[in-house]
Amino acid sequence: MLPTAVLLFVLHFVAADIPSYIKVCQRNDPQVDKCIMNSVDLLRPKMIEGIPELNVPGIEPLSLGQIALARGPQGAKLTAVVNDVKVRGPSNFIIEELKSDLDKNRFDFKLLLPKLDFAGKYKMDIQVLLLRLQGRGNITGTFRDYACNVTMRGHKEKIGEDEYLQFDPFKVKLRVGQSSIYLTNLFDGDPVLGPATNRVINENSQVFLQEISPVLEKSLADLFTEMANKITSKFTYKELFP
C-alpha cells in the first residue's frame, strides 16, 4: 500500500506544473484544431534534441532499421542491404490539416515533409548470367515533398483519481515525392560501372522507395507514439485539455 501511495504522490507532483513549451488547449474552443497545431509548432524546437526532463527522445536524426532489396530472376538478380541509416529533416514537417475528435481521442494529421536527407552503408550484389558484380560503401540521398498522413487514436487510463491520455501505436502513411540517391565506391570505384549504376538507380528510384517507405513509416510511427505517450503520461487529461 505504501509504495502505491508514494507512486501516486510522485505522479501528482510531476503533473503539477505544465512547462511553458506545452500549450494547453481548451476542449470547448471552437478552433481547438488550430490550437493543437500551434501547440505542436511551439513544441517543435524541443522535438529536435528531445526533452530530458520528460524522458522524451529526440527526433533528429531518425535511425532506420535494415533495408533489404532483392529483384530479378536467378540469372539476372540484384540484392542489396542498407544499414546504419540516419535521416535528418523529420522535424521540419508542415501541418497542412488536422481533424480532431476529443470525445473519441482521435487526431488525423496531414503533413508535408519538405526535405529528408539520409545517409547509411550499403552492400550490393549483382548477378548477370556468369558475371557477378559486388560493391559496398556509403549511400546518401534526398527525398523531397513527401506527403504524410498520421492517425492518432488514444484512450484514457485511470491512475488513482486522475485520468491520463495514452495513444495506441500511430499509423503513418507516406506518399512519395521526388528523390535522388548516390552510392560511393560502386564495384570498387569502377569509373564506368559506378556512374552508370548510379544513373540506373536514380532512373528506377521507385524500386528503392518501395522498400524504404515501409521502414520509414514504421520508424516515424514508433518515434511519434513514444514521444506523445511520454508527454501525456506526465500530465493529466484535464491539464492538457481543460
Q: Where are the regions that the model predicts?
A:
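Cleavable N-terminal signal peptides of Sec/SRP-targeted secreted and luminal proteins
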Residues: 1-17
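Sec/Tat-exported extracytoplasmic proteins
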Residues: 40-47, 51, 55, 201-205, ...
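Extended amphipathic ligand-handling, pore-lining, and cofactor/metal-binding catalytic surfaces
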Residues: 163-217
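Short, charged/polar low-complexity linear motifs in solvent-exposed/disordered segments
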Residues: 126-127, 184, 226-228
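Noncatalytic linker/hinge segments flanking ATPase motor cores
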Residues: 151-163, 191-193, 212-215, 225, ...
